[in-house]
A protein has these predicted regions:
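Single conserved hydrophobic/aromatic residue that forms the stacking wall/gate
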Residues: 1-15, 19
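Domain-level signal for soluble alpha/beta catalytic cores
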Residues: 13-362
């Protein structure tokens, strides 16, 4: 990828060749991964790690780049004014955003050898307070978006991601604020278990409207695993002319449970979570394996989707699987599995025969 001049939109006009030449891979798994590593409070889900342990955040960006993510998304998800108010830390709003943006910019400007140029994305997301027919609340949300977009532009973001919207009108409002900045936009929606937006729009209607309003990339992210996201990506890709994004969660969602919020654990669990549901801290046995994620990436890539990633639950191994499934060799490919050398299951002639024979009963 060759970064275009800052005055040139990334996904349109003269810079369209950038997008055509190489797929864009976006790791969006920061929230769950930071919680797993002990640097983020589950339930609150606020990216305080940017201020408290910036070196940890920088390292995770680097790990995702090593695995193939050529987009470095600033970890400002849930770092908006409303969420900071809920945890009584609204005074840290701007410092958190600016530090997260600067860390992402630093990593994008210093990609690992073998990755190529990385792009840095600012981020705005679901406010969790949007209400239909409530102009006062809607104005408040737009103001929240506006300040975060402003900071992202000032910290030299290449484009802005607006993500995880389950109200169509909120997604439209996010796009409106991004467009005011002059930066390219990626807008991804996250319909919940009713398989429609909470304000009544269908998934396809919402995506078509986003394209009409000028979004550069439109698609789905979060909540849905590969099985329940793929059918909608197929529909969207057929209808939309703009670029399409697909970023599932790595969990085995089903037709009965299309999102990860109410997934049951039928795997013999004898110690359920204290809050009574698998989401968000007891979903470990419900994860997709890496090959399922790779298969999803290959399927959507073959449909013509070139903006691909993995959302909550992603780890670097998932991102590498995405990259390799669509034909890329990335720095982490150096450590791709090599079962031929395994002490029981390897095919190498140097592996003792008696150990190979023992493999099926080990």
């Amino acid at each position: 990828i060759r970064r275009p001049p800052r005055s040139t939109p990334l996904y349109s006009s003269a810079a369209s060749d950038v997008y055509k030449r190489q797929p864009l891979i976006c790791a969006e798994g920061y929230l769950f991964e930071m919680e797993r590593r002990g640097y983020l409070t589950s339930g609150e889900f606020v990216p305080e790690v940017a201020l408290e342990h910036p070196e940890v955040l920088e390292n995770l960006h680097k790990e995702f780049q090593h695995a193939g993510s050529n987009i470095v998304q600033a970890f400002t998800y849930n770092g908006h004014r409303e969420k900071m108010r809920v945890i009584d830390k609204e005074h840290l709003l701007e410092p958190l955003n600016r530090v997260a943006l600067r860390i992402a910019r630093k990593c994008a400007d210093n990609p690992p050898k073998g990755l190529g140029v990385s792009l840095m994305a600012g981020n705005i997301s679901n406010s969790n307070i949007w209400e239909n027919n409530n102009p006062e609340i809607q104005a408040k949300v737009k103001s929240m978006f506006a300040e975060m977009v402003k900071w992202a532009k000032e910290e030299k973001a290449d484009f802005i991601i607006g993500e995880t919207f389950y109200y169509a009108e909120e997604a439209f409002a996010a796009l409106e604020e991004i467009k005011k900045s002059g930066l390219p936009s990626v807008i991804t929606i996250s319909p919940m278990g009713e398989n429609k937006m909470r304000d009544g729009y269908t998934i396809l209607e919402t995506c078509k409207k986003l394209e009409e309003l000028g979004a550069d990339v439109v698609g789905l992210n979060c909540f849905r695993g590969p099985a329940t996201m793929l059918p909608y990506i197929k529909e969207i890709r057929k209808v939309l002319k703009c670029h399409v994004a697909a970023l599932p969660v790595p969990y085995r969602t089903t037709k009965e449970h299309p999102t990860f919020f109410n997934l049951p654990d039928n795997n013999g669990c004898n110690c359920p979570s204290p809050h009574g549901r698998t989401f968000p801290t007891a979903m470990d046995p419900l994860q997709c394996n890496r090959y399922e994620i790779g298969n999803f990436a290959k399927e959507v890539f073959d449909l013509g989707v070139k903006y691909i990633g993995v959302c909550c639950g992603a780890s670097p191994m998932h991102i590498r699987e995405v990259a390799e499934a669509i034909g890329l060799r990335v720095p982490a490919s150096r450590f791709r599995e090599n079962m031929s050398k395994h002490f029981m299951y390897g095919s190498d002639k140097k592996i003792p025969k008696h150990m190979k024979e023992y493999g099926n009963v080990a």
